[in-house]
Amino acid sequence: MKTASTIMTTKVVTVTPETSVAEIASLLLEHKISAVPVIDDEQRVVGIVSEGDLLGRPPCGSPRGWWLRLFDESAACLEEIATARHLKARDVMTSPAVTVGEETPIDILATLMRRRRVKRVPILLDGRLVGIISRADVLDALARYGQEAASR
């Protein structure tokens, strides 16, 4: 069975604990990703900020995601939106993040993701971020593994 290092994305978009939620929202949209690991100065993962972390905080009872309102100056509740602009990654991140080492077998990773109900997992080497794996990456790897096994 393949390991995390064989399927991980190595060019990971990251933020620091001091990154603003507005900047995080922009990064998610710009890179078409659903989460960013939060790292310290030594590339150690201290948390993760996902779309769910951002969307889970609607101001004024609005059904619209509050972070989308950061881009809409005409929206109601400007005071709350102004407050939201001052939030940082450290204020909204999930911490600690679920992480694994790069030698973790993919089947173990899939089980962990299911049990912990996470959609992506930062991959570490010597405690430092070296990649990230999404559920789609795991499904693709398991499907390819199944096809390879069937063709033997």
Predicted regions, residues:
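Bateman/CBS regulatory modules and CBS-like beta-alpha motifs in cytosolic regions of diverse proteins
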Residues: M1-I33, V38-D41, V45-V46, L68-L112, ...
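Short hydrophobic beta-strand motif reused across regulatory alpha/beta modules
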Residues: G47-S50, L124, I132-L139
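A short, polar/charged loop-to-alpha-helix boundary motif
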Residues: L55-F71, L139-R152
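Structured functional modules or segments
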Residues: V118-K119
